[in-house]
Amino acid sequence: LRSFASVQGSLVMYPIHAFGSVEQKEKWLPGLGKGELVGCFGLTEPNYGSNAGGMATTAKRNGDGWVINGSKMWITNGSIADVAVVWAKDDDDVVRGFLLEKGMDGYSSNDIHGKLSLRASITSELAMVNVQVPDSARLPGVEGMKGPLSCLTQARYGIAWGMTGCAADCYQTALKYAKERKQFSKPIAGYQLTQAKFTEMLTKITEMQLMVLRLGRMKDAGTMNFHQVSMAKRNNCAMARDIAKTAREILGANGVTLDYSPIRHLANIESVFTYEGTHEMHTLIIGEDITGISAFE
């Protein structure tokens, strides 16, 4: 559900609101906001993940419109989306955003099966074969990688908060269990090793909460930048991953069943740890901000 809401708000409604025409906003935003319409975001490709700027999807001029060819991979809500925000390179190699509608000739989607993570979330591949769209389908307010990257900043901000919630649930679930589960005549919460684990978990959760709270206040003030968001996404995903693992351990054998939430969170965090920028990419984004020297293209 968090992934669904993140895509709908940060990756679909945001670019339409920030970069769309008046007509595009009036057509799509009310329905998307009410949940009557579903959107998806097409940036990642089979051969271009972290290096999204190398995308192979093209948008060629064709009279007053465009012809779009290419494919997008790992797209949340892809097969159920009424509208897709698709990023493609034009004849001058400039990245532009387009709104593709469900049912357009040459536009199709297929679901990806066999996932062990985000199993409740629809993940799809998008295919565009000579999809003809009018110029009115183009997002007029942006060009270049600034467009999709600014969307990712919004989504990463939400992820930092979402991981805080995952971590808190894992902690609370494990704590309740540890107080009730008795071994050697007393609750396992009464042992020093277990208490040390809870101390570390709660300290990390508090750090996560303080980071996103500070980030939220900066966002409200208009002073938040993408480097800071990268730090929060990187930090909170890593901490949530550690906390989910520790919570699973405290639950013992019961922890590998779906009766308890940490194993589900642990599996889902593996996806979140990767999407919207890997741990390594965020490390380099922060490193560039610190040193002023880019370690990547």
Please give the residue ranges for each predicted region.
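Short Gly/Pro-enriched turn/cap motifs at secondary-structure boundaries
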Residues: 32, 47-50, 74-77, 89, ...
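Flexible, small-/acidic-enriched active-site or ligand-binding loops
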Residues: 54, 103-132
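A short, Trp-centered hydrophobic/proline-enriched beta-strand micro-motif
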Residues: 35-43
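A short core secondary-structure module
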Residues: 69-109
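Cytochrome P450 core scaffold surrounding the K-helix E-X-X-R motif
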Residues: 50, 109, 136-142
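Helix-loop "lid/cap" segments that line or gate small-molecule binding pockets
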Residues: 10-18
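Alpha-helical interface subdomain recognition
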Residues: 4-7, 19-24, 31-36, 51, ...
